[in-house]
Amino acid sequence: VMNLWPGVRLRVTEGWDEDGHHSEESLHYEGRAVDITTSDRDRNKYAMLARLAVEAGF
């Protein structure tokens, strides 16, 4: 993220869910999922952000 979009930071908005906000099969209940966005919340970056996550092994 730093190299691709200088000044933009990665934001983790949720990592663990115990309140039932996700589907029953969600990995959030096991602590194995995260919801992420960028600091500028530019939705046009989301596809590339997903690609970067996959390339990083997530």
UniProtKB/Swiss-Prot annotation:
PTM entry text: The C-terminal domain displays an autoproteolysis activity and a cholesterol transferase activity. Both activities result in the cleavage of the full-length protein and covalent attachment of a cholesterol moiety to the C-terminal of the newly generated N-terminal fragment (N-product). The N-product is the active species in both local and long-range signaling, whereas the C-product has no signaling activity. Cholesterylation is required for N-product targeting to lipid rafts and multimerization.
Keyword Chaperone applies: no
Transmembrane segment boundaries: none
Main location: membrane
Domain notes: The indian hedgehog protein N-product binds calcium and zinc ions; this stabilizes the protein fold and is essential for protein-protein interactions mediated by this domain.
Role according to the record: Intercellular signal essential for a variety of patterning events during development.
Name of the featured protein: Indian hedgehog protein
This protein's encoding gene: ihh
